[in-house]
Design a protein with these regions (language model features):
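Conserved active-site alpha-helix within GNAT-family acetyltransferase domains
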Residues: 88, 112-136, 144
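Conserved acetyl-CoA-binding loop-helix of GNAT-fold acetyltransferases
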Residues: 83-100
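Conserved GNAT acetyl-CoA-binding A-motif
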Residues: 98-117
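Flexible loop residues that form catalytic
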Residues: 65, 111, 139
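A short, internal acetyl-CoA/4′-phosphopantetheine-binding micro-motif in the GNAT/acyltransferase core
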Residues: 75-83, 112-114
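Acetyl-CoA-dependent GNAT
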Residues: 3, 7-73, 78, 91, ...
Length: 156
């Protein structure tokens, strides 16, 4: 099995990768308007895609929230590639890119643990990647989806 991480530059290819992954994950990305926004907004940001035997397996997008902090804007791994280390590889590549671009911190927002089993899996993943809970905003998105913010120090 050949696993490869590549930075995608072309906007049409970014759109294709985003659609292919997010449409495979309706349990996480089931709100059409939000999913559409992730697909459109990802086109102007650094995007890393993971390919398994030349098939898109997952992707991660970097968004700058400040001069010091890179945000995981969106990340997804197709279901058939879950539990194969794809998320770990994408996260590691994201951190390398963030440090190369001068960021010393990374943050990610997700739905707080205890709300939905799918997001409990997501929270466990980020904790396993070394992220720490920073703060929860109960109504940032809406009252049914409290926004948990995680942060990680990447180094100087």
């Amino acid at each position: 099995m050949k696993i490869e991480i590549k930075e995608v530059i072309d906007k049409r290819e970014k759109e294709k990768v985003s659609k292919e992954v997010l449409y495979d994950l309706p349990e996480w990305f089931g709100l059409p308007e939000s999913t559409k926004n992730y697909i459109i907004d990802s086109q102007d940001k650094p995007l890393l895609a993971c390919y398994v035997n030349d098939e898109v397996a997952g992707y991660i997008v970097l968004n700058a929230t400040s001069k010091d902090c890179a945000d995981i804007f969106v990340m997804g791994v197709k279901k058939k590639f879950h539990r194969m280390g794809i998320g770990l590889k994408l996260n590691n590549a994201f951190e390398i890119l963030a440090k190369k671009l001068g960021y010393t911190y990374s943050q990610v927002k997700t739905v707080k643990t205890g709300c939905y089993k799918e997001y409990d899996i997501t929270n466990k993943f980020y904790i396993a990647m070394g992220y720490k809970e920073l703060e929860c905003f109960p109504t940032l998105w809406d009252e049914w989806n409290p926004s948990q913010i995680y942060i990680k120090y990447l180094g100087e």
